[in-house]
Protein backbone atom coordinates (compact mmCIF):
# COMPACT_ATOMS: atom_id res chain seq x y z
CA UNK A 1 0.00 0.00 0.00
CA UNK A 2 2.71 2.47 1.02
CA UNK A 3 4.57 1.92 -2.23
CA UNK A 4 1.58 2.79 -4.42
CA UNK A 5 0.39 5.97 -2.72
CA UNK A 6 0.56 8.56 -5.47
CA UNK A 7 -1.80 11.39 -4.48
CA UNK A 8 -0.34 14.63 -3.20
CA UNK A 9 -2.08 14.20 0.16
CA UNK A 10 -0.73 10.67 0.53
CA UNK A 11 2.80 11.76 -0.23
CA UNK A 12 2.55 14.53 2.37
CA UNK A 13 1.31 12.04 4.96
CA UNK A 14 4.12 9.65 4.14
CA UNK A 15 6.67 12.45 4.46
CA UNK A 16 5.23 13.33 7.89
CA UNK A 17 5.36 9.67 8.94
CA UNK A 18 9.01 9.36 7.92
CA UNK A 19 9.84 12.49 9.92
CA UNK A 20 8.08 11.12 13.01
CA UNK A 21 9.81 7.76 12.70
CA UNK A 22 13.17 9.51 12.51
CA UNK A 23 12.43 11.55 15.65
CA UNK A 24 10.64 8.81 17.59
CA UNK A 25 13.49 7.72 19.85
CA UNK A 26 14.11 11.27 21.08
CA UNK A 27 12.29 12.78 24.05
CA UNK A 28 10.85 9.52 25.38
CA UNK A 29 10.71 8.27 29.00
CA UNK A 30 13.60 6.15 30.26
CA UNK A 31 12.36 2.56 30.32
CA UNK A 32 14.70 1.69 33.21
CA UNK A 33 13.20 4.54 35.25
CA UNK A 34 9.66 3.39 34.51
CA UNK A 35 10.57 -0.14 35.62
CA UNK A 36 11.81 1.20 38.94
CA UNK A 37 8.45 2.90 39.47
CA UNK A 38 6.61 -0.32 38.57
CA UNK A 39 8.66 -2.33 41.09
CA UNK A 40 8.33 0.20 43.93
CA UNK A 41 6.33 -0.77 47.03
CA UNK A 42 3.42 1.45 48.03
CA UNK A 43 4.74 2.72 51.37
CA UNK A 44 3.69 6.35 50.97
CA UNK A 45 7.28 7.51 50.51
CA UNK A 46 8.05 6.41 46.96
CA UNK A 47 6.48 6.91 43.57
CA UNK A 48 4.51 3.87 42.42
CA UNK A 49 2.74 2.83 39.25
CA UNK A 50 -0.61 3.17 41.01
CA UNK A 51 0.08 6.78 42.02
CA UNK A 52 1.31 7.64 38.55
CA UNK A 53 -1.79 6.13 36.95
CA UNK A 54 -4.10 8.04 39.29
CA UNK A 55 -2.31 11.27 38.43
CA UNK A 56 -2.70 10.63 34.69
CA UNK A 57 -6.42 9.97 35.20
CA UNK A 58 -6.67 13.34 36.93
CA UNK A 59 -4.93 14.97 33.96
CA UNK A 60 -7.40 13.25 31.65
CA UNK A 61 -10.27 14.65 33.71
CA UNK A 62 -8.79 18.13 33.31
CA UNK A 63 -8.35 17.57 29.58
CA UNK A 64 -12.01 16.67 29.27
CA UNK A 65 -13.15 19.47 31.56
CA UNK A 66 -11.43 22.15 29.49
CA UNK A 67 -12.19 20.45 26.17
CA UNK A 68 -8.52 20.23 25.23
CA UNK A 69 -7.21 18.09 22.38
CA UNK A 70 -6.07 14.51 22.86
CA UNK A 71 -2.70 15.68 21.55
CA UNK A 72 -2.40 17.94 24.61
CA UNK A 73 -3.14 15.05 26.96
CA UNK A 74 -0.72 12.75 25.14
CA UNK A 75 2.07 15.33 25.39
CA UNK A 76 1.32 15.95 29.09
CA UNK A 77 1.68 12.22 29.77
CA UNK A 78 4.93 12.16 27.81
CA UNK A 79 6.35 15.05 29.86
CA UNK A 80 5.21 13.51 33.15
CA UNK A 81 6.73 10.12 32.40
CA UNK A 82 9.97 11.64 31.12
CA UNK A 83 10.29 13.52 34.40
CA UNK A 84 9.26 10.62 36.65
CA UNK A 85 11.64 8.23 34.87
CA UNK A 86 14.55 10.59 35.64
CA UNK A 87 13.73 11.95 39.10
CA UNK A 88 12.83 10.45 42.48
CA UNK A 89 9.55 12.25 43.08
CA UNK A 90 7.89 12.04 46.48
CA UNK A 91 4.14 11.33 46.35
CA UNK A 92 3.36 14.65 48.07
CA UNK A 93 4.92 16.51 45.13
CA UNK A 94 3.24 14.48 42.39
CA UNK A 95 0.22 16.78 42.02
CA UNK A 96 2.42 19.81 41.41
CA UNK A 97 4.63 17.89 38.97
CA UNK A 98 1.62 16.54 37.06
CA UNK A 99 -0.11 19.91 36.80
CA UNK A 100 3.14 21.56 35.69
CA UNK A 101 3.54 19.01 32.88
CA UNK A 102 -0.10 19.49 31.94
CA UNK A 103 0.24 23.28 31.85
CA UNK A 104 3.38 23.05 29.69
CA UNK A 105 1.53 20.80 27.24
CA UNK A 106 -1.50 23.13 27.18
CA UNK A 107 0.64 26.18 26.43
CA UNK A 108 2.50 24.23 23.75
CA UNK A 109 -0.52 22.80 21.90
CA UNK A 110 -3.67 24.82 22.58
CA UNK A 111 -4.56 28.21 21.13
CA UNK A 112 -3.50 31.05 23.40
CA UNK A 113 -7.09 32.21 23.95
CA UNK A 114 -7.96 28.79 25.38
CA UNK A 115 -5.07 28.61 27.86
CA UNK A 116 -6.47 29.05 31.40
CA UNK A 117 -4.87 31.24 34.03
CA UNK A 118 -2.61 29.33 36.41
CA UNK A 119 -4.80 30.43 39.34
CA UNK A 120 -7.91 28.97 37.71
CA UNK A 121 -6.11 25.75 36.81
CA UNK A 122 -4.92 25.24 40.40
CA UNK A 123 -8.36 26.01 41.85
CA UNK A 124 -10.23 23.70 39.50
CA UNK A 125 -7.65 20.97 40.16
CA UNK A 126 -8.38 21.40 43.90
CA UNK A 127 -4.71 21.70 44.86
CA UNK A 128 -3.44 23.93 47.66
CA UNK A 129 -0.09 24.97 46.24
CA UNK A 130 0.43 28.48 44.87
CA UNK A 131 1.07 29.86 41.40
CA UNK A 132 4.67 30.44 42.47
CA UNK A 133 4.96 26.76 43.40
CA UNK A 134 3.58 25.79 40.00
CA UNK A 135 5.97 28.11 38.14
CA UNK A 136 8.97 26.83 40.12
CA UNK A 137 8.03 23.24 39.37
CA UNK A 138 7.51 24.12 35.72
CA UNK A 139 11.09 25.40 35.54
CA UNK A 140 12.40 22.24 37.22
CA UNK A 141 10.50 20.06 34.74
CA UNK A 142 11.84 22.08 31.80
CA UNK A 143 15.40 21.72 33.06
CA UNK A 144 15.08 17.96 33.51
CA UNK A 145 13.60 17.44 30.03
CA UNK A 146 16.35 19.70 28.62
CA UNK A 147 13.79 22.35 27.61
CA UNK A 148 12.45 19.98 24.95
CA UNK A 149 8.70 20.23 25.43
CA UNK A 150 7.71 19.01 21.98
CA UNK A 151 7.90 15.25 21.61
CA UNK A 152 6.77 12.52 19.25
CA UNK A 153 3.65 10.95 20.75
CA UNK A 154 1.47 7.92 20.07
CA UNK A 155 -1.37 10.30 19.20
CA UNK A 156 0.61 11.74 16.29
CA UNK A 157 1.24 8.24 14.93
CA UNK A 158 -2.42 7.34 15.48
CA UNK A 159 -3.47 10.30 13.34
CA UNK A 160 -1.03 9.52 10.53
CA UNK A 161 -1.66 5.77 10.43
CA UNK A 162 -5.41 6.39 10.40
CA UNK A 163 -5.14 8.97 7.61
CA UNK A 164 -2.92 6.72 5.48
CA UNK A 165 -5.34 3.81 5.88
CA UNK A 166 -8.27 6.07 4.97
CA UNK A 167 -6.49 7.07 1.75
CA UNK A 168 -6.49 3.42 0.73
CA UNK A 169 -10.23 2.94 1.27
CA UNK A 170 -13.07 3.66 -1.17
CA UNK A 171 -15.21 6.63 -0.12
CA UNK A 172 -18.16 4.48 0.97
CA UNK A 173 -15.95 2.55 3.43
CA UNK A 174 -14.14 5.47 5.06
CA UNK A 175 -16.44 5.50 8.07
CA UNK A 176 -15.78 1.87 8.96
CA UNK A 177 -13.12 2.89 11.50
CA UNK A 178 -14.07 5.67 13.92
CA UNK A 179 -11.16 7.91 14.93
CA UNK A 180 -12.86 9.07 18.14
CA UNK A 181 -12.98 5.45 19.29
CA UNK A 182 -9.27 5.11 18.59
CA UNK A 183 -8.61 8.30 20.58
CA UNK A 184 -10.64 6.95 23.51
CA UNK A 185 -8.67 3.71 23.43
CA UNK A 186 -5.36 5.59 23.40
CA UNK A 187 -6.48 7.66 26.40
CA UNK A 188 -7.28 4.47 28.30
CA UNK A 189 -3.81 3.10 27.50
CA UNK A 190 -2.12 6.31 28.62
CA UNK A 191 -3.67 5.73 32.06
CA UNK A 192 -1.45 2.63 32.46
CA UNK A 193 2.26 3.20 32.98
CA UNK A 194 3.18 0.02 31.14
CA UNK A 195 2.24 1.58 27.79
CA UNK A 196 4.79 4.35 28.28
CA UNK A 197 7.42 1.66 27.77
CA UNK A 198 6.14 0.99 24.25
CA UNK A 199 7.42 2.93 21.27
CA UNK A 200 4.72 5.45 20.26
CA UNK A 201 4.48 3.96 16.76
CA UNK A 202 3.99 0.44 18.14
CA UNK A 203 1.30 1.52 20.59
CA UNK A 204 -0.59 3.45 17.91
CA UNK A 205 -0.44 0.62 15.37
CA UNK A 206 -1.47 -1.93 18.01
CA UNK A 207 -4.61 0.08 18.80
CA UNK A 208 -5.56 0.46 15.14
CA UNK A 209 -4.83 -3.19 14.31
CA UNK A 210 -7.08 -4.36 17.17
CA UNK A 211 -9.89 -2.07 16.06
CA UNK A 212 -9.63 -3.34 12.49
CA UNK A 213 -9.92 -6.91 13.79
CA UNK A 214 -12.90 -5.98 15.96
CA UNK A 215 -14.71 -4.24 13.09
CA UNK A 216 -13.76 -7.05 10.67
CA UNK A 217 -12.29 -4.61 8.13
CA UNK A 218 -10.36 -7.30 6.26
CA UNK A 219 -9.57 -4.89 3.42
CA UNK A 220 -7.32 -2.95 5.79
CA UNK A 221 -5.27 -5.94 6.96
CA UNK A 222 -2.79 -5.51 4.14
CA UNK A 223 -2.56 -1.82 4.95
CA UNK A 224 -1.60 -2.63 8.56
CA UNK A 225 1.08 -5.03 7.34
CA UNK A 226 2.49 -2.36 5.02
CA UNK A 227 2.54 0.24 7.79
CA UNK A 228 4.23 -2.27 10.09
CA UNK A 229 6.89 -2.98 7.48
CA UNK A 230 7.41 0.69 6.64
CA UNK A 231 7.72 1.58 10.33
CA UNK A 232 10.14 -1.34 10.89
CA UNK A 233 8.01 -2.77 13.68
CA UNK A 234 8.89 -6.31 14.71
CA UNK A 235 5.97 -8.73 14.37
CA UNK A 236 6.49 -10.18 17.84
CA UNK A 237 6.58 -6.70 19.36
CA UNK A 238 3.32 -5.79 17.66
CA UNK A 239 1.64 -8.99 18.84
CA UNK A 240 2.95 -8.48 22.40
CA UNK A 241 1.58 -4.94 22.68
CA UNK A 242 -1.69 -5.83 20.94
CA UNK A 243 -2.34 -8.42 23.63
CA UNK A 244 -1.63 -5.88 26.38
CA UNK A 245 -3.84 -3.26 24.72
CA UNK A 246 -6.65 -5.80 24.36
CA UNK A 247 -6.37 -6.72 28.05
CA UNK A 248 -6.34 -3.04 29.05
CA UNK A 249 -9.43 -2.19 27.01
CA UNK A 250 -11.29 -5.22 28.34
CA UNK A 251 -10.52 -4.18 31.92
CA UNK A 252 -11.37 -0.56 31.15
CA UNK A 253 -14.82 -1.52 29.91
CA UNK A 254 -15.51 -3.48 33.11
CA UNK A 255 -17.01 -1.96 36.25
CA UNK A 256 -13.86 -2.79 38.22
CA UNK A 257 -11.79 -0.21 36.40
CA UNK A 258 -11.46 3.26 37.92
CA UNK A 259 -12.37 5.76 35.21
CA UNK A 260 -11.56 9.48 35.07
CA UNK A 261 -14.08 11.52 37.05
CA UNK A 262 -14.99 14.78 35.34
CA UNK A 263 -18.04 15.24 37.57
CA UNK A 264 -15.95 16.10 40.64
CA UNK A 265 -14.40 18.97 38.70
CA UNK A 266 -17.77 20.35 37.67
CA UNK A 267 -19.08 20.72 41.20
CA UNK A 268 -16.19 22.62 42.81
CA UNK A 269 -16.41 25.67 40.54
CA UNK A 270 -18.04 28.46 42.54
CA UNK A 271 -20.43 31.00 41.06
CA UNK A 272 -17.79 33.70 41.26
CA UNK A 273 -15.21 31.53 39.49
CA UNK A 274 -17.80 30.46 36.93
CA UNK A 275 -18.46 34.07 35.96
CA UNK A 276 -14.75 34.63 35.42
CA UNK A 277 -14.05 31.48 33.43
CA UNK A 278 -14.46 31.28 29.68
CA UNK A 279 -17.46 29.41 28.26
CA UNK A 280 -15.17 26.88 26.59
CA UNK A 281 -14.15 25.63 30.05
CA UNK A 282 -17.53 23.91 30.33
CA UNK A 283 -17.30 22.07 27.06
CA UNK A 284 -17.08 18.62 28.63
CA UNK A 285 -15.99 15.80 26.32
CA UNK A 286 -16.84 12.51 27.97
CA UNK A 287 -14.61 9.53 27.36
CA UNK A 288 -16.90 6.94 25.75
CA UNK A 289 -17.21 3.45 27.17
CA UNK A 290 -15.09 1.04 25.17
CA UNK A 291 -16.84 -2.28 24.45
CA UNK A 292 -15.00 -5.45 25.36
CA UNK A 293 -12.57 -6.47 22.66
CA UNK A 294 -12.01 -10.00 21.43
CA UNK A 295 -8.28 -10.81 21.54
Curated annotation (Swiss-Prot):
<dbReference type="InterPro" id="IPR013763">
    <property type="entry name" value="Cyclin-like_dom"/>
</dbReference>
<dbReference type="GO" id="GO:0005737">
    <property type="term" value="C:cytoplasm"/>
</dbReference>
<dbReference type="GO" id="GO:0005654">
    <property type="term" value="C:nucleoplasm"/>
</dbReference>
<dbReference type="GO" id="GO:0000082">
    <property type="term" value="P:G1/S transition of mitotic cell cycle"/>
</dbReference>
<dbReference type="Pfam" id="PF00134">
    <property type="entry name" value="Cyclin_N"/>
</dbReference>
<dbReference type="InterPro" id="IPR039361">
    <property type="entry name" value="Cyclin"/>
</dbReference>
<dbReference type="InterPro" id="IPR036915">
    <property type="entry name" value="Cyclin-like_sf"/>
</dbReference>
<dbReference type="GO" id="GO:0005634">
    <property type="term" value="C:nucleus"/>
</dbReference>
<comment type="similarity">
    <text>Belongs to the cyclin family. Cyclin G subfamily.</text>
</comment>
<dbReference type="GO" id="GO:0000079">
    <property type="term" value="P:regulation of cyclin-dependent protein serine/threonine kinase activity"/>
</dbReference>
<dbReference type="GO" id="GO:0016538">
    <property type="term" value="F:cyclin-dependent protein serine/threonine kinase regulator activity"/>
</dbReference>
<comment type="function">
    <text>May play a role in growth regulation. Is associated with G2/M phase arrest in response to DNA damage. May be an intermediate by which p53 mediates its role as an inhibitor of cellular proliferation.</text>
</comment>
<keyword id="KW-0539">Nucleus</keyword>
<keyword id="KW-0131">Cell cycle</keyword>
<protein>
    <recommendedName>
        <fullName>Cyclin-G1</fullName>
    </recommendedName>
</protein>
<dbReference type="GO" id="GO:0051301">
    <property type="term" value="P:cell division"/>
</dbReference>
<keyword id="KW-0498">Mitosis</keyword>
<keyword id="KW-0132">Cell division</keyword>
<dbReference type="InterPro" id="IPR006671">
    <property type="entry name" value="Cyclin_N"/>
</dbReference>
<dbReference type="GO" id="GO:0000307">
    <property type="term" value="C:cyclin-dependent protein kinase holoenzyme complex"/>
</dbReference>
<keyword id="KW-0195">Cyclin</keyword>
Amino acid sequence: MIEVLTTTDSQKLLHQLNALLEQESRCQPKVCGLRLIESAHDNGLRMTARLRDFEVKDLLSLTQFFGFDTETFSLAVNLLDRFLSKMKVQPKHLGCVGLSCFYLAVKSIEEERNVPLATDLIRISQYRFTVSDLMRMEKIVLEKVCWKVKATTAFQFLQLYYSLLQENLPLERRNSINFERLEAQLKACHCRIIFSKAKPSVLALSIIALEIQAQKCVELTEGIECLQKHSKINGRDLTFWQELVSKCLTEYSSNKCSKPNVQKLKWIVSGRTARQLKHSYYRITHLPTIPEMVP
